[in-house]
Design a protein with these regions (language model features):
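Short acidic-glycine loop/turn motifs at beta-strand connectors
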Residues: 36-41, 114-119, 150-152, 213-216
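Active-site nucleotide/adenylate-binding loops and adjacent lid/helix of ATP-dependent enzymes
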Residues: 1-108, 113-116
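Flexible, glycine/charged-enriched surface loops at secondary-structure junctions
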Residues: 207
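Protein kinase-like catalytic core scaffold
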Residues: 19, 121-123, 219
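ATP-dependent carboxylate/phosphate-activation module, predominantly the ATP-grasp catalytic core
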Residues: 48-80, 99-191
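C-terminal active-site "lid" helix and adjoining low-complexity regulatory extension at the edge
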Residues: 166-191, 198-203, 212-245
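Glycine-rich phosphate/pyrophosphate-binding beta-alpha loops
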Residues: 29, 128-134, 224-233
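Anionic group-transfer/hydrolysis microenvironments
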Residues: 24, 90-91, 111, 126-128, ...
Length: 245
């Protein structure tokens, strides 16, 4: 939500110290910032924005304001309100994910479909691993997708890096296996996605980005009403017809 007051914003920041702020209507990690509270100012730890092309013209000045370092809590609050930014707790991912890519949370995209009789099902699931030191894991330029076997929770296929043509069966930064990677507590991840699919029945097709926290619990980061069904085809090198029918 973006309807928080300055006192609520400050209370949240003081509780968690390190927070995430992100626009409520963007994609691919654009405009995300990791901020750390230091006294009465925030230090910008890292950003999901790659350059000025990732922010709208009217927000360019605000982008540079945050990008350049320390800002007062009031200035950051004003920036968030002006640009409809959400504020979130900074989440530490489980060690099995950070071992593969320590810079990002490495969420799991679980795409669900709600049938006419209101029965949820999972169409497909895929790991999102960041690389190149990026904090976001769903950016086309800095993400490796791995298709997950829904029964075993293991990665079976990876997508092609469109910039280089490489297929990374091992993570290019850490050298850890991507193909064969076993997701932690995957049954809980699936259960959470199926439960979430019932919350907004008007949206029958949603791609849930779910994190496995450091304590092993699953938590939804966001839901995407444009879940990128082409991801399945790009990763599996197969069509979706047999999956959807």
């Amino acid at each position: 939500a973006t309807d928080y007051t300055l006192d609520e914003f400050m209370g949240f920041a003081e509780k968690y110290k390190r927070i995430i702020i992100k626009p409520d209507n963007m994609y691919a990690g654009i405009g995300i910032y990791v901020l750390e509270l230091s006294g009465k100012s925030f230090h910008v730890i890292s950003s999901g924005a790659r350059d000025d092309t990732d922010v709208s013209a009217e927000n360019t000045a605000s982008y540079h304001m945050l990008k350049d370092g320390y800002e007062s809590t009031k200035a950051v609050y004003d920036f968030c309100k002006m640009n409809n930014y959400c504020i979130e707790e900074y989440i530490e991912g489980h060690r099995v994910y950070s071992k593969v890519s320590p810079s990002s949370l490495n969420t799991i995209r679980v795409t669900t479909y709600l049938s006419d009789d209101k029965k949820p099902s999972i169409i497909f699931a895929a790991n999102q691993f960041g690389y190149k030191g990026c904090i976001v894991d769903n950016n086309d330029d800095s993400c490796i997708w791995g298709l997950i076997d829904l029964e075993t929770g293991a990665v079976t296929d990876v997508d092609i890096d469109t910039a280089t043509g490489n297929i990374y069966e091992k993570h290019p930064d850490s050298g850890q296996d991507i193909v064969g990677f076993k997701n932690y507590n995957f049954e809980a991840v699936k259960k959470l996605a199926l439960e979430a699919a019932l919350v907004i029945p008007e949206c029958r097709l949603i791609g849930w980005d779910i994190a496995v926290r450091s304590d092993g619990t699953a938590e939804i980061i966001e839901g995407n009403v444009t879940p990128e069904l082409d991801l399945y085809q790009a990763i599996s090198h197969k069509g979706l017809r047999t999956v959807l029918i």
